[in-house]
Amino acid sequence: MSVNYATLGDLKKGSYIVIDGEPCRIVEMSRAKTGKHGSAKAHVVAICVFSGQKKSLVAPVDTRVQIPVIEKRLGQVLADMGDMVQIMDLETYDTFEVEKPGGNEEEEQLAAKLQPGVTVEYWLIMGKPKIIRIRSSSS
């Protein structure tokens, strides 16, 4: 599990954070200064990268939180196996299986285009791969 650490107050909308052991993208963040002797609090709403679930976190802004390290890599689709796709990394030539994207209309369209021989960009987040997009054949 590759993670870095940062202060919660330094994060912004669009950043990534680990909540309940799952990598999430921050979609909403607000800070509130509490009473006379209290510390400022941050309220974070994030969407899980893999499951799409909405997660919430309320903590002091000086709390150290985990930030997932995201490796952006290229791979080639070798086989379509129903709800899984076999991919070969184009740098290391390792082969592995990845779950097809799904959940919303955009991800369903991406899953429909996954054919053997297609080059895809995938992210390796905390040791787990996720297909992000199809690379155009011109690049």
UniProtKB/Swiss-Prot annotation:
Location(s) in or outside the cell: Cytoplasm
What the entry lists under InterPro entries is as follows: IF5A-like (IPR001884), IF5A-like_N (IPR048670), NA-bd_OB-fold (IPR012340), Rib_uL2_dom2 (IPR014722), Trans_elong_IF5A_hypusine_site (IPR019769), Transl_elong_IF5A_arc (IPR022847), Transl_elong_IF5A_C (IPR020189), Translation_prot_SH3-like_sf (IPR008991)
Against PANTHER family, the record matches this protein to: TRANSLATION INITIATION FACTOR 5A FAMILY MEMBER (PTHR11673)
- Which domain of life does the protein's organism represent? Archaea
By sequence similarity, the record places it as follows: Belongs to the eIF-5A family.
* Transmembrane stretches, start-end: none
Q: Which UniProt keywords apply?
A: Cytoplasm, Hypusine, Initiation factor, Protein biosynthesis
Determine if Cytoplasm is one of this entry's keywords.
Answer: yes
GO biological processes:
positive regulation of translational elongation; positive regulation of translational termination
- As stated in the Swiss-Prot or TrEMBL entry, residues carrying the post-translational modification Hypusine are K36
- Output this protein's name: Translation initiation factor 5A
Q: Which HAMAP family match?
A: eIF_5A
Function as written in the Swiss-Prot or TrEMBL entry: Functions by promoting the formation of the first peptide bond.
Kindly list the GO CC terms recorded for this protein.
cytoplasm
* A Pfam entry, by short name: IF5A-like_N
* Main location class: cytoplasm
**What GO molecular function annotation could you give as one example from this UniProt entry?**
translation initiation factor activity
